[in-house]
């Protein structure tokens, strides 16, 4: 390749060489033999000699003629050429080396600039945010000087050592706006860029206090390591020890006291780091260092910042109010610091005090923690002085004798007023529950209820004072609590009437009295007049109080176990438990309750006592946390073990001054408050009124008219509870009284097995075997702790004053509807409750109502005979007033309670679904009718009788997808995926599920029988699946022959005689429609390849139509002219053609006259287009324009070439005129006329009609529309401008059918156009024009400037008059 290049180069440069010989001399070969000879020379470059390859080499001469001739270039040329090559190579190399560093530098510069631009707005935002935080922090510090006051007090208590310690504290001046490390921006914190001095170097301070810095860092690390291993109690003790030893300075050890005192004597020259400026130091304010920012320095700075942050965090936990000193490397200012320093630049005239005021700052510390630490320290130092602020303690009353052990643990609890977030509140509540559960046992005697209620009031009072006016979000559980309270009042009223008939109930001892609670706050008395007693039975009163205290203790234990299940909203509900408690007489009664509960025959009495006395005191419908008590003992679950005593209160009673008009005077005494009554506040009244509004929507006027009676057949399952007092009669296992009717309940029944937190109805097992049914409530609170679940919640807040309420505000609620399937007399298994899955959603992203399926959809009812009560339509919530409670009729205890109750309220938050658990009951063995039934609809008729029932099988369950979950838990601020929901649901169910369930063999068989086996879905190919039978059959030719009854011989014989085309068409059509449809056996059919099912009609393709026309040529020809549409269409088309031709001809004729009258004569030019005038007379759709030589409408826009003789209007010269005429002509046919009999009659009849109509249209167009123009001067343009639609004429073979005629003409036949050329021409069309309705609309826009008399108004008036005249003519 190199030789070839050299050869080419030599070829181009032969003129520069002395010779172009084909050979060169060689020292060793004087004869010059060989084809290629190299030249011996200092130049190592080989040169190729030129040689013809095609010719043979000539014989070498005896002597080389070129022996003394040098054929190569001169040495100077070669040297120059080499230098040029080297120069080019060097140039190329230098260019490459020169480009690389420039490109790298450019990339680096671009990266730096882009990074600055990208981070610039972040820095600005961070600086602004820090500045705002600093301003707010300074404002808060000016408002509450807790740090200064506490340090002064500590200095006074500590004496000279305390003052020395106070003096040794370093208060840093650095603005926290300069520290952007917590924002993710690793900037330098050297911000002491004050204008007081510019030559101060922090290295001097660093060198002066190097030893102290080392000690400070060592002490900080040691303290940080020690603090992590201490609990909160040890931290508080460590704070006290530091305060007594005098080491409570800046977190240093005891060995630092020397440097601290020396720094104090030197005028408080504190240890200063590059980022901090001492507030009272004698040194000048530091200016930013001028060294470059390096990565090593940044890394070291980051490490030291992390160490400082950790030491500060531990120091804050231990009460160190000032962060430890950290030796920073010397760093200079950066652009970020320049921007940051702009916020704290001061004038030189400012004094040191002004600088201190501007830059005083407190190290990062949590204000709430700081206040709590110092308040606790002050309380301990005062040695029994004033007690500290009340902590958030719910169960101080239960500690009783163990107050000494729980005292240090109470220190852990934070002040309720200082809780900064819901997460902190939740953690504090969990710590309280853990501390309480670790220190409390069931056997501890319960202190008086008065003390406990007072402690609850103290714990909530401070938080409630900070709360805005209350707004309640109440679900079905709170409404059930309310109904239970009203129900007890009605039970008490009915008990007064039916006390003689209540003696046969199953009660060994008198039942505890019911809590009669009235809705309006009548008085603040605290007597026992609401409790009806036959005698002054002090033992029974004590029993009631004991049961109430036992229920409260059980509640608290359930609250402790629910700490992991409640969500963040429930944490706030625990703080809103009560506002105004009232004391109750003390009575330690838990042992008594346990003794009474151990007796199976007497088990129901304490249960009712717990039901009634454990109810939360009436606070005008204000309730605390709504939770459900799951009385299940995991160790003892045997469905067939014992009978179940089911009791529930499901009705809402009517409340008023005199709820029952026929009540006895004893009823009046039940109106005053009971011993749990508390004085209502404004928030309580608001809460109560809100619930009244809810209750008013629940009531139904029809319920008041029904007889309040219960029909309970022996096969029915009843759940009722009796709150009335019963005498101590011998126990009768089955009550002898029965209701007789069961009205449809409209209120929400309480879900079985899950009474509210303050239970109104507790299920107790009354078993002669002495065992406790695990599916019912435990009879002794000393057993294993009952499980707990969340069913409802109450959140109280003011949506107008809160930025973002924890949960959506309560919209107007509608009726909470629930279904109660009624059973027949046949006993059947029954699922009362089940635990639904949970879905974690965001309050702002909750679905709309009625989008979540009820939990009952997940269960299949095993009882096919069960009836569902109709769901009452909810009433609209009355707005604009707070209605009083209008009580509905007391609903009867349902025979069966639905699986769940869903609040289908219309609002922006999801329905709250009551969480239930499966309890299976069977009908009672025997139920007797009850005597002395009352007919008063308002009288309480459901004083409940205890019925025993035994558990039965659990019916089958249907698979429920995670998306159909009906319980929402607001635990996080973001929605979770279905997989997370499934996991959380499974975890919750596993935790709540009773352990060690042992089912009987029979029950297990029944469960297996009703269980639904879930099979995985198989992929099904639609194309391979059999197609469903359509009931039609494809009609084949053989089937047609078979249906005709022809055999093969007849068919062969018929082939000899060709049938007529008409017979073939008729036979095929009839047989296709009348063929019997046989249903073949379903088989695998490929839809794409299978035949189309017969539908009774025949699919006619275009080819078949052509074929039919070809075969039935004569038949079609004979029928087509006789069709009624033909004649009608012919007459109509002729009339439209004549009319339109006349209209267009007259407009052309009058165009020249109109142009003459509208423009002066000077502008007349032949064939000059007029853009201002545009005739918009459209071609009517139903008509056509035949090629009759007439001009089109488009010609009207041209000026005539011949001068017009009508120049009367030209006497008035016009300066300018723009005349636009828009005309629209619509031709409508009135009705098709009948076919004319003879053409002669139609011709005679057509002449006068055509002249009259033409005259009217002619006059109208001539005077108003047309420009008069001679038609012979211009050729027609309609053929060239647009194509015409030509209808049927005498010379046309095309039959065009208008779309409007398809509908208007009956009994007509239409044919597709045949492509055959030999289609005969139809007869001539008649001459009679069809009666048409021609509607003409004209819009004239004239803009002209007249020089003389003619005005725009006069011309417009003239045009209007002419138009009116023509319209009148057309109408006449």
From Swiss-Prot:
InterPro entries: DUF4757. GO terms for cellular component: cell-cell junction; cytoplasm; zonula adherens. GO terms for biological process: actin cytoskeleton organization; morphogenesis of embryonic epithelium; protein localization to cell-cell junction. The keyword rRNA-binding does not apply. It comes from the Eukaryota. Changing residue 679 to E: In RNA edited version. Residues 486-499 have a biased composition (Basic and acidic residues). Residues 1-67, 178-199, 238-287, 380-414, 427-447, 486-531, 652-679, 799-820, 860-897, 1151-1181, 1231-1250 are annotated as: Disordered. This is Uncharacterized protein CG43427.
